[in-house]
Every structure is written in structure tokens, then in C-alpha cells.
Amino acid sequence: MSSTENPDSVAAARELEALRAEASALRRQLAESPEQLREMESRVDSLSIRNTKLMDTLKEARQQLIALREEVDRLGQPPSGYGVLLGVHDDQTVDVFTSGRKMRLTCSPNVDAETLKLGQTVRLNEALTIVEAGNFERVGEISTLREVLDDGQRALVVGHADEERIVWLAEPLATVFEESERESVAYDAESPTRKLRPGDSLLVDTKAGYAFERIPKAEVEDLVLEEVPDVHYDDIGGLGRQIEQIRDAVELPFLHKDLFHEYELRPPKGVLLYGPPGCGKTLIAKAVANSLAKKIAEARGQDSKEAKSYFLNIKGPELLNKFVGETERHIRLIFQRAREKASEGTPVIVFFDEMDSIFRTRGSGVSSDVETTVVPQLLSEIDGVEGLENVIVIGASNREDMIDPAILRPGRLDVKIKIERPDAESAQDIFSKYLVETLPVHSDDLAEFGGDRTACIRVMIERVVDRMYAESEENRFLEVTYANGDKEVLYFKDFNSGAMIQNIVDRAKKYAIKSVLDTGAPGLRVQHLFDSIVDEFSENEDLPNTTNPDDWARISGKKGERIVYIRTLVTGKNASASRAIDTESNTGQYL
């Protein structure tokens, strides 16, 4: 430093330099402060997010602790008991059957004793207080109702081994329609709320002594078909006379009761339809039920679409049961069902198909004598103490000679109608039900009649019937030898039936479909029907019974002199040579 410099100026220069450095530092700090601020703000945001997550975690943990505490409390609760409500008292106490004991208990404040119903299931806590009302019991033993006692709250039922007991009726059973109410509502005999009748199956808790529910009889449901059949008289061909007979026997008494009463004429109790298989016996019975329902609906001023009648179609062979008395019990249940339906004023037809399988002549059984008790059961139902108002029995059989004579006498099955095999005129009528104008007809056949479809179908039917009923060599079926030595040639027309005619038409339709697939030419032809006739005849070659030709002939509708020998005479497409059928001395069972 120069000697001439002033010390004060030097100090001032240093101070100035220090101030400049401090100012520069302040400028740097001022420049860096926004970045620090942003960093601090970022840290604050991060801490806030962590704080929120920690709060959510704590809240979730608190909820889990509460749920676990509730689960621990629930698992630590003593078990609840159940009982059946027997009675409610004015002091809000109730009688309950629980654990094999009858106890008087109190209700929780959450349960209103006035809303409890007799027979209802209730839940009890550890202090034997009712804390909840449940439903009625759904499982138990099945017992048969013998009668409802005079108080209307109890019933006499029969359980296993004919053990009788008195039970209370739970509220669903105790609440029944009165006679006046049944007239004002649409009363259904199968409704769960209908009046109980002897023979009903009830769900019973024998320990609590309560009956809870009426159970439908499954065994009877399997044996009967309740419906208005969708079959009309117009659907049946070739049986005009027989249809008129059965209409006179069944419809007139229902539709004109006043005239029958005026002339003191008792309506028939039953009708027997007999004849060869496949000739329309079941169809007629169904058509009667349909027609009767519509006629009664019209007489009452109701819409025919609302027509109501009942057709109980009994599956005959299924009635037979290996256990003694079961068949008779089913017959009783069936007629009980018929009386229930008829009590509504609705006609009921009880139709026994294959009647000879159930009610054959007593003493004729080869390996069993079940008919000795089944036949009297039917007789007692038809003309027993309880009348069959609005109920008519229709039986069908192709072996009427095997039905017990007591069933066929007047006063039981009064009217007997034979369903004959169709003759040529009847066959044309039957063909017209299946060969209708809506079917496709081959153009060549239509061209023969100038495109007149009606004339073409009519002539087609005439040609087919002429082919079927011609006594020609190709139509010969059997040569039978009678016991007196006489011989007779039987033709296929002697064994024709409505079912066979339907089968022939179905075969022809199949031929027409195959023709379309092969040639592309659509339509039914007369030749298709001719081929179907040959096929049908050929398939029947082996049908004559080889064991007892006389029984087979009876079923087929050929009665008279006893047949001892049969020889087939089938010729034509795919037919085998004529052959003899040996008969055995020990005839055994037919078919």
C-alpha cells in the first residue's frame, strides 16, 4: 500500500466490498427462495396424502375390530331352540311345544303375540323367550284324514299301521271356506284352502300333535289325467252311428235333466265301448268329454272357450299292484276324486281303458285271484250307498267276453256300443280326415283333373279304398280252419282299422318327402298310397298269434266258430312265402 493512501479510505473500500458481497448473497438467496418454497409445498402435499391414508387405514382397522367383536359376540351366544306354537293367552304368554315338553313362555318385546298363528314355528333364546316367529313346518309324517271333529280345530287321522290319533289343525288347514263363501268365489276342489274331506293326505307332526298341510295324492295323480280333451266328433271318421248312440247315452241326461226327471227316466251309469283295437274307442270317449263340456257351457251362457269338464283317463294296467288291497284303495281314491269334481256341478267322465285287464271275470285268473276283490270294489263304487251324481263311467275293451258279467248288467254299464271295423264307406270317411286339401299334391295327379284339387283328393281316396277292399289275390291275408273243418279266406279288409289307415297315410307322406329329396318333384301321388298299403300289409304278416289263434281272432274282432288252424297267404312286395302256423294244445296266455 502506498504511504500516501488514507487509512480511512481503505477501510471504506473494504466495507464497500463487504456490502457488495452481502448484496450479492442476498440476491442469490432471493433467487433461490421460490424453489425452496415449491419444495416445501411439495413436502406438505406429500405429508397430507400420507396423513389421509393413515386415517383411512385407522378407520378400516376400527371397522374390522368392530366386526370381529360382533362375530366374537355372535359365536359366543348360546344356541337357540325351536318349538311349535300351541296357544296364545291374553296376558301375552304363549304355550309352546319344545324339546318334547309343553311349556308356557313369554315373548320378546320385538314379537307381537297377537300376530302369532297356531302351529307356527317359533325361535327361543337361552332364557326360553320367543324372539322370532317362523314359518309352518314343511316336513313330517303323512297321515290320512278320517274326519274333522265338530269344533273344526281338531281332526282324527290314521297313520302307519292304521294307528289313529287326534291332532290339531294348523291355521292354514283350520281356515276353510264356508258353504256361502264357496258359492261366491271360484271354488277349486284342488285348492289348498278347500274344505278338508275324508281320505285327504295330511302333513303331521305327531310329537307336537299338529297337522300343517294337505298333500296332493301323487299316486292318484299318476293314474288319472284331468283335462278337457282336444278331440271333436269331426275328428272321428266312419263312426256316425256309434257317436249318436253315445251322445244319446251321455249328453242327453246332462243337458236335459228336467225331461229325464219328468219322464222318471234314470240316466245310464256307464257305457261300454267294445270292438277291435285301433277303431276309435278312446277317441270317442275323449270327444264325448269335449262335446259335453261345450254343451253345458252354452246352456249356462258361458263362453265355449271356458268350457269345463273332467276326463279321468285311468291307466288300467297301472292300477294293478302286488300288495294286497292297494288296487282297491286306488279305485276308491279315483271315485272319491270324481265325486269331488262332480260336487261343483261339472260333469265327470271316468274312462277305464283296457277294462278287461282290471275287471276280468272272477275265478278266471291263471296265476292270481286279484279280480275277486277288485271287481266288487268297482261294483260298490258304481251302485253303492254314495251316489254318483254327474259322474258317468265309460269302459273300453277289445275282449268284452273277459269282463265280469256283474259289471255289464243293466244298472251298471247300461249302454254297450260295438265299435266295428270300418267298411269301404267308413274307410273313405276316415281317409278324408288325413288326406286333406291342404296337403301338397303331385302336379301330374292334379293335371289329370284339370288342377281341381278337391276332385283329385276325392278320387285318390276312392282308388285307395278300392285297392284296400278288393277281394283280390294280393289282398289275401289268412286262411283259417274252424273246429268243424270249414275253411275261410280272410282279406286285409277284414282287419282294417282307423289306426291302420292313419299309418298308411303317414307312410305315403314319408314316400312323398323322399321323392322330393330324390327328384325335386313335390307332392303326394296315388302310387305313394298304393306302396304304403303293400308295406302295411306285409308288416302284418307275422301278427297272427302262434299260440292261441282263437283268442287272437277274438281280439281282432272275428268271433263265432272256434279257430284251430291259421295259414298266412300274404303275397306282394317283400312278402315271404305262404306258411302255416302251428297251434299248441296248451294255449297259455293270448298275445
Curated annotation (Swiss-Prot):
Gene3D superfamilies: 1.10.8.60, 1.20.5.170, Nucleic acid-binding proteins, P-loop containing nucleotide triphosphate hydrolases. The keyword Iron-sulfur does not apply. SMART domains: AAA (SM00382). Disulfide bonds: none annotated. Pfam families: AAA, Prot_ATP_ID_OB_C, Prot_ATP_ID_OB_N. Residues 8-77 form a coiled coil. The keyword Endoplasmic reticulum does not apply. Consists of three main regions, an N-terminal coiled-coil domain that binds to protein Pup and functions as a docking station, an interdomain involved in ARC hexamerization, and a C-terminal ATPase domain of the AAA type. This is Proteasome-associated ATPase. It comes from Rhodococcus opacus (strain B4). The lineage of its organism: Bacteria, Bacillati, Actinomycetota, Actinomycetes, Mycobacteriales.
